[in-house]
Regions:
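Mixed-charge (Asp/Glu-Lys/Arg
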Residues: 3-87
Length: 87
């Protein structure tokens, strides 16, 4: 959706989403995901997010459509995202 420049000059490819989302087509492409989490924004590499929500890869949606998203991630997921929340 957009490119962001890190303070060190690195360009980040960012997909802006309305909810936490993983997508098979983003794997290995150095894409970052940006989405709201309980009143804050999260910016995280997609492949790191994929590791955090690895159980989602066992869902029918992931297997058939190649994507999965959740409007309200559970407490464990939110805790795992803490290092990626921005203010």
């Amino acid at each position: 959706d957009f490119l962001a420049m890190h303070i060190d000059g690195t360009i980040l490819k960012v997909q802006l989403k309305s909810r936490i989302t993983i997508n098979k087509s983003y794997i290995g492409k150095e894409i970052h995901m940006a989405f709201p989490v309980r009143g804050q924004w999260c910016l995280i590499p997609h492949d790191v997010l994929l590791e955090i929500v690895s159980s989602w890869q066992e869902t029918k949606a992931w297997e058939t459509k190649g994507l999965y998203h959740a409007k309200n991630p559970n407490k464990t997921t939110v805790e795992a995202l803490q290092d990626y929340l921005i203010s």
